[in-house]
From Swiss-Prot:
InterPro entries in the record: Macro_dom, Macro_dom-like
Protein name: Uncharacterized protein TK1890
SUPFAM superfamilies: Macro domain-like (SSF52949)
Disulphide bond pairs: none
Organism: Thermococcus kodakarensis (strain ATCC BAA-918 / JCM 12380 / KOD1)
Pfam families found in the cross-reference section: Macro
PROSITE patterns attached to this UniProt entry: MACRO
Matching NCBIfam families: PRK00431.1-3 (NF001662)
Entry superkingdom: Archaea
Residue stretches making up the Macro domain: 1-180
């Protein structure tokens, strides 16, 4: 059984074996949680961008990520918190508009990261609210989609035991709890 828990905290310090980065398709890590993770992992975000782009070319053979594809990079300085991997995924850009196409792209982004965690053999994985920040998707819809995808993923899960949705602000944490 895969347990899903919504928690308040800083994903860069959250003690899961893998954390997910809500990245843009070029792994630029220029703002939001992507910048915070890059800075915490490498000290210099530009260095983590270089490492991420190199990993993307090695793992995918191209210079961008599609919805559902993921890239794994080392946790580097995050290892002191028990984090072993950073899994980069790309959610949809909503700009405040939510529809079935956006939901399907988010489902692919979440499922891609979960399947990669399974492949890596990790027991715990922590996600930020992918696409709910800078990308402007409604938080409540993002949370509901997370819950649905995790319920479906449970049928294929082997090593993954716990999935966390980590919200940084108290307000978002409370909104997320009300959504499920």
């Amino acid at each position: 059984m895969v347990e899903f828990e919504i928690v308040k905290g800083d994903i860069t310090r959250f003690p899961a074996e893998a954390i997910v980065n809500a990245a843009n398709r070029y792994l630029e890590h220029g703002g939001g949680v992507a910048y915070a993770i890059a800075k915490a992992a490498a000290g210099d975000p530009r260095e983590y961008i270089r490492i991420s782009k190199e990993a993307m070319r090695e793992q995918l053979g191209k210079d961008h990520i599609e919805h559902g594809e993921v890239v794994v990079t080392p946790a580097m300085r995050l290892e002191k918190h028990g984090i072993r991997y950073v899994i980069h995924t790309v959610g949809p850009y909503c700009g405040g508009i939510w529809d079935e196409d956006k939901k399907e792209k988010l489902r692919k982004a979440i499922l891609g990261a979960l399947r990669k965690a399974e492949e890596l053999g990790v027991k715990t994985i922590a996600f930020p609210a992918v696409s709910a920040g800078i990308y402007g998707c409604p938080l409540e819809e993002v949370v509901k989609t997370f819950k649905e995808v995790i319920d479906e993923f449970e049928r294929e899960a082997g090593s993954v035991e716990r999935v966390y949705l980590v919200l940084y602000s108290e307000k978002d944490y409370e909104r997320a709890l009300r959504a499920v």
